[in-house]
Amino acid sequence: RFPGWMLTGHGRAEGERRLAVELEVTGTRARTEVLYRRFLVLNPEVLRVASAWQVRTINGVDVPNDHADEDHDAAVIAEMEALHRRAEGLLAEFEAPLPRLAGYRPRLNLALGRVRSGEGDWFVRPGLDSYHTVWFELHENLLATLGRRRNDGID
């Protein structure tokens, strides 16, 4: 990542072409598709928990989470830890056919560790390698790897 920089349309297309070649040369497309479907099961759960960190429903009204309720925050962190354990196994499976994905697990571990130590910004804050930021980046990487776009039916 380079702050202030982004790929051109041509650069994105070339990157996706190379990713498609990687899947074909390594013969890992089918396995990656299966793993991606499993990722899609976890994705809405991660997003739900990230939302629970940011917003609470009190008396039927959604309000920003001010993090004053330590029990609520502890429950949300516990949910994220359970999801993270599931994600770790899946990410390990992704790394076998696609070793370039190996950097995501340590980054997610680091973010979750910082949340556990009381640094709540590492849960969802943009601009940090927060759990949500890294998860989103992983999702974008998987979409590009498989030549997909969000909202194309299976995202």
Regions found by a protein language model. Name each.
Residues 1-2, 24:
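Acidic/polar low-complexity scaffolding segments in large eukaryotic proteins
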Residues 2-9:
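Minor-groove-contacting beta-hairpin "wing" of winged helix-turn-helix DNA-binding domains
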Residues 9-38:
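Short, amphipathic alpha-helical interaction segments positioned at domain boundaries
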Residues 20-24, 51, 58, 120, ...:
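Short, flexible helix-adjacent loops and helix caps
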Residues 26-33, 40, 70, 74-77, ...:
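Short, amphipathic alpha-helical segments
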Residues 30-66:
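Active-site-proximal alpha-helical scaffolds that flank and shape metal-associated catalytic sites
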Residues 60-155:
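Charged, low-complexity intrinsically disordered regulatory/assembly segments
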